[in-house]
Amino acid sequence: MITKKLTEVTQVTSPSDGYLTPIHDGTGLKAITFANLRSKVNEPVNASITALSEKEATDISTVNALVAPLVYNNAGAHNAIYRGKNLGTSLTDAQSKVIKAGTFDDLYIGDYWVINGVTWRIAGFDYWYRCGDTECTTHHVVIVPDSNLYNAKMNDTNITTGAYVGSLMYTTNLATAKTTISNAFGDHVLSHRIYLNNAVTNGYPSGGAWVSSTVDLMCEEMVYGSGIFHPVSTGSTVPANHRVEKSQLPLFALEPSRITNRGTYWLRDVVSAAGFAFVYGSGNADYYGASLSGGVRPAFAIS
């Protein structure tokens, strides 16, 4: 038998699986194929890779579960997320399409369009959906401008006779707002049915009727989430507060700073025989005599 030193043996750089490699097990010299040696050496590495892959799969699944609500395409999910993205200078056909479909893809609370110098901000999705004496079945986006469009009186004198529907604001002073909004969104402005007060007795709203609405002042519930100054039941006198706007707009719930724009603006609620509810420029809830020239900051829906 010829004996050679290891350094004298011909070296190979690409061993085949069948090559034999000497190995000592502590009792004597043995041989192991290169394939078996490679498999044994890689066992802990393969185990680590398998464990890592399983963990990654679990982590990805967890992340997907957490992210999923952010991409659900329905009003409920989109009403729960404030984003505040600039959507452009006009309502696009693509945006209108997803609104009509009720999926609201890539539209979230706080997103806005800047049209004709006015910032029109998304305040809610499907807020009036399924409401009205004639059911609203049109998917829609509620819009509220960031700033007051202009100033106007509720009435020429400090009276609330006829409530909101009987006011100068409703009959005349909202006309400019309707024109401005129509110029910005055209025939996308939605007409839907709401209940509005039309009579007052001793400072209480005492009557109302279902009307078709396109552009109207907000009520306290839409802004604050509850009534603040408008009259409620005394046990013997029950106001005609049969409104469909029973909950706060998501815009104001998710980002309360949007309630105040540092300009006072009217709400449509009768507070007394002389005044209507008001959001004061300092951010506090308030009311004022109807003859004050206050801000007009209406809400409306587009589809």
Model-predicted regions and their roles:
Residues 41-74:
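Heptad-repeat coiled-coil amphipathic alpha-helices that mediate oligomerization/assembly
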Residues 68-303:
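Collagenous Gly-X-Y triple-helix signature in extracellular proteins
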